[in-house]
């Protein structure tokens, strides 16, 4: 696949789940600058004692090949809404990232992020299949 197709910049829809089965949807905007990732997320607050109905966070991380890692830091000032570490793997089409999230010593679970296949890439793949 072309390097351009592997660029992760864009809007991703995600879901993370807790060990007890509860899950939370989120939207992430990623900026891929080579091996460095940055961006932001927003998600509904589904637990009690939330600082706001919608939680916002910043993302900083990296990508090496198919391995994607980043830290999500919530903008809330309460220390309970701190940093979450994400470790995932990118699929071959660069449309899904799947892996685990952890809050050191407190919580962990699975996550998945998806984005639609770029229109231009769809056409390139159709042409490749014909050859």
Which residues are covered by each model-predicted region?
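Central antiparallel beta-sheet cores of small beta-barrel/beta-sandwich binding domains
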Residues: 2-131
